[in-house]
Amino acid sequence: MTKEIQGIAASSGIAIAKAFRLENPELTVEKKSVTEVEAEVARLEAALEKSKSELEIIREHARKELGDDKAEIFEAHLLVLSDPELINPIKDKITNENVNAEHALDEVAAMFINMFESMDNEYMKERAADIRDVTKRVLAHLLGVNVSNPSLISEEVVIIAEDLTPSDTAQLNRKFVKGFTTDIGGRTSHSAIMARSMEIPAVVGTKTVMEDIQNGVLVIVDGLDGEVIVDPSEETVKAYEKKAAEYAEQKAEWAKLVNEKTVSADDHHVELAANIGTPEDVKGVLENGGEGVGLYRTEFLYMGREDLPTEEEQFTSYKTVLERMEGKPVVVRTLDIGGDKELPYLNLPKEMNPFLGFRAIRLCLEMQDMFRTQLRALLRASVYGNLKIMFPMIATVDEFRQAKAILLEEKAKLQQEGVQVSEDIEVGMMVEIPSSAVIADLFAKEVDFFSIGTNDLIQYTLAADRMNERVSYLYQPYNPAILRLVNMVIKAAHKEGKWVGMCGEMAGDEIAIPILLGLGLDEFSMSATSILKARSQIRQLSKADIEPHLDTILSMSSTEEVIEFVKSTFHIG
């Protein structure tokens, strides 16, 4: 009997295939007394080594298929396996209490997971998820249990799961896995982001697919509208095959725009750029018609290693990106470490709330040797392309002035050394803290440009952790408060003749695009795979026709009102 299940559209496309339930066995742990504690510690170490080997393989597969930025999460998992704060208490428990490795691991991991989950911030939630994923793998080795391996799937299927861990998602073979659907998760969960990178249709947050779908049943995953159809009729299958064909035709039409400029129906030009993490990501930017790089996340250069990258290593990476972009603008964000990104070799003290703590520009202004090394590398690379530099997490005008002063000092030093440096480097800032948006008029007199980081701006403005399912309903890109802040920033910048970009998820969202175009956003930076769809949409919109509706939109009192109005007025969905 056909059943329709509603979820969240996480990755566009239509998948029609038999269900494959990805079920991991219950890992039952019993407490046992042991006398040979050294042998038990050796068992633990062997399981840790096996897990490391597996994760290294998964990391390399993810790097090859998805790029360095998506593989970075497995660096975090490998760090968990080597973290003495986790591993030493497990060994101590085995030695001091004469208990088996499984019990010691389970007890210590549960303690850390509960501790991190009780703390109300995104970084700690992700830390708990990392520990859960990693310790489950180690526990399976200790128990001699085989955990499901998605990479072994050898027929066309739709995966059904309660959730997909990052390691599960990275192992999906796109040849056979046509789509997936999960009980939990949202558009910003790791599995959803990776699905979009891999272009695998996905519907998440359904709550009931594991309960409602058995192995082998035909399933349709509609990643366009967020629906899952179980055991569809022949007529329904034909209808969705037609929908899939229409979507494929639409994608083919978008592909024709790869070398076109992004111009609205009334001839207003905007720039569509891409967010990248490594030089390898440039290929995807160019293949999808990106007009620039709107966000180069430099922190990936610093991760998965035992010490800071040298000036020469950084110079080589920046130079490569600038050369490959062949004169198109490249906006580089200086080091944004802290919050959800740790560098163990810096030995920074633990913080109760790292997202509001010692991170990004705050860290760089104090650890100036590290900051100056990065700036020197960027300045040296500037002659190889169109470089723009921006500072993250700026809260006060004085912070921006300090950061820019250090940049100018390093520029002067290089020139004294006879090193050529571009004279056309624009220097801007991220707007991701509400205070920055509120005084954007003051910042606009200092900066060359703004880039609005909506992912953090939304969280900080609405005090809502987007990874916390209990409050994720408050993560609202179209909330009137967010739209008004964006409007304030754009108006303040344009008054001073400065340009404004946006590099959060919102920039590529089909509901946000008409509003942002009307407000006058100059640059939209998104995942490379979203560029052509966004270009097609903008070419059909008239900025002049949108502008009369802006006061109405900005005066609405809820997200729901905004979405309904935009959909009906601009014919979306």
Swiss-Prot record:
Keyword Metal-binding belongs to the record: yes
UniProt: phosphoenolpyruvate binding residues: R297, R333, N455, D456, R466
InterPro entries: PEP-util_enz_mobile_dom (IPR008279), PEP-utilizing_PTS_enzyme (IPR050499), PEP_util_AS (IPR018274), PEP_util_C (IPR000121), PEP_util_CS (IPR023151), Phosphohistidine_dom_sf (IPR036637), PTS_EI (IPR024692), PTS_EI-like (IPR006318)
Gene Ontology CC terms, in alphabetical order: cytoplasm
Complex and partners: Homodimer.
Recorded family membership: Belongs to the PEP-utilizing enzyme family.
Protein name stated in the entry: Phosphoenolpyruvate-protein phosphotransferase
Source organism of this protein record: Priestia megaterium (Bacillus megaterium)
